[in-house]
């Protein structure tokens, strides 16, 4: 068992991490984008030690080195949770998004930001030995690119709107698992089930 898998790692609280990023001066970096970007990197095969992770975050987001130890720990916790959840046999990978009590429009926007981060992180990471994505994997990336544009009306809070967003969110979660499954060796991944067509959110 690897060090990453020896203990269970949970994602940090979204709002707490958001506040830490603001304190570091990363005013435009949201936890959703950070998580999506790192998930894309890991899905493409990247692995980091603590120093390398912090350096990669600074490079990817063009920010100054973290001054706060809590911010450094939070970033490492995000990475460790991503890696552990991707490798878990129960498909327990989670998206780092605002809590469900936030307005639907904010949650939808954050989902689009997450997808944008994932695509950027995946595209920046050189794929060595992955053999390329399958047709399904390539279609999944195109679907994520469409979901980047997701939006809802500011007053959209109905049950149908909520159900639609949750359906899209679940598709994105399973899409990330599929892409990780295709780009990583069998002993470093859990087999991800095939994903279906993404639903449309109005």
Regions found by a protein language model. Name each.
Residues 1-115, 119-202:
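Domain-length accessory/inserted modules outside core catalytic folds
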